Amino acid sequence: PEEMRAYRYGSYLNGGNGGPYGDEFAPAAAWLRLADEMWDASTAPLPNGEPAIPAIWGTDAVHGHTNVVGATIFPHNIGLGATRDADLVRRIGAATAAEIAATGIDWNFSPTVAVAQDDRWGRTYESYSEDPLLVAELGAALVEGLQGKAS
């Protein structure tokens, strides 16, 4: 929070094996406490009267909110693609969104909508399929689960 007050950066990302206050095994409550502290630091009044712009926190919850101890870990996209079940993927998105919200994080770098075309690619597991139509269907289902239905 001290660096946020000093530099007012607009966004930040937590990486793998990182946790609030240097504790990679921190519970969800510690993540939420840090989110609140960062929000307060980013919205604190500036000395020259300029408007304070809230920072946004991003996480890489591509198969559940896996940085948080106790969160649900779901199969990677390659396994979900094998099910060809958009409703399942939608429900996974909703469960992931609820767990992210409980930690105060605003932004998820998901879904991965890569279309794997070469099995030698090191991130093939992040693709639902080689079929672009299935990737589009399951990617849309995950977004709907994460964000809810448009009204």
Q: Residue spans of the language-model regions?
A:
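Glycoside hydrolase catalytic-domain context in secreted enzymes
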Residues: 1-151
